[in-house]
Design a protein with these regions (language model features):
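Conserved ABC transporter NBD signature motif
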Residues: 19-26, 38-39, 192
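Catalytic Walker B motif of ABC-type/P-loop ATPase nucleotide-binding domains
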Residues: 134-138
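Conserved ABC ATPase signature
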Residues: 109-113
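Conserved catalytic motifs of ABC-family nucleotide-binding domains
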Residues: 130
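Helical segment within the ABC ATPase nucleotide-binding domain
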Residues: 149-161
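Conserved ABC ATPase "signature" region
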Residues: 72-105, 153-156
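Helix-to-loop junction immediately C-terminal to a conserved catalytic motif
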Residues: 11
Length: 195
């Protein structure tokens, strides 16, 4: 229907053939995804993208480092001058993991997580840099009903804390439960708006 493509276009993961993407009065149409993330719009993916050979904590800290334009090596091994920044990132990572109920898995490798726990990790990685806009691509796909309820509660809390959320989701009941506005896509067209 074009929902994920829409997210790809507005988050810089795919170039558009036509039209413009405006974020805070700035044309970001041809911007790279990392530039858009620095401007405050981040996303999750339908298929989780975590670093399986890193711990849950390392995944979180790496995500915080990348937005600061650190190189890959610097984001893994910080020089002594950045020790305080690293401590702050670590504390924030633990706080987020605790709030997402994955704090007890901080030292586990991401590959050891269940699919639902990987969804939580990806959500945590997406919010560690305090985004203004969060794009969630099927956050409930493949998770059990109990975890789906937990994720919905987390999404509601993020929204209450001032994060604007755009969500692609097939679970209509869940969408209606937490959304202020619903837009329905079919065959790359909007077929309903503000239902």
């Amino acid at each position: 229907a074009g929902k994920t493509t829409f997210f790809d276009l507005i988050s810089g993961f795919q170039d558009s053939d036509d039209g413009k993407v405006i974020l805070n009065n700035k044309n970001i149409t041809k911007s790279q995804s990392y530039t858009i993330a620095r401007l405050g719009m981040v996303r999750t993916f339908q298929l989780t993208k975590v670093f399986d050979r890193m711990t849950v904590l390392e995944n979180m800290m790496f995500s915080a480092s990348k937005v600061d334009n650190d190189s890959f090596i610097k984001s893994l091994v910080k020089p002594p001058s950045q020790k305080n920044k690293e401590i702050d990132i670590k504390e924030k990572s633990f706080e987020i993991m605790k709030n997402l109920n994955i704090g007890h898995m901080a030292n586990s490798y991401a590959r050891e997580l269940s699919g639902g726990q990987k969804k939580l990790l990806e959500l945590g990685r997406s919010i560690i840099n305090d985004p203004e806009i969060l794009l969630l691509d099927e956050p409930l796909a493949g998770v059990n009903p109990k975890l789906a309820e937990e994720i919905l509660e987390i999404i509601l809390n993020l929204s209450k804390n001032g994060i604007s959320i755009l969500m692609v989701e097939h679970n209509i009941e869940a969408v209606m439960k937490i959304s202020e506005r619903v837009i329905v896509f079919a065959e790359v067209k909007v077929i309903a708006d503000d239902i």
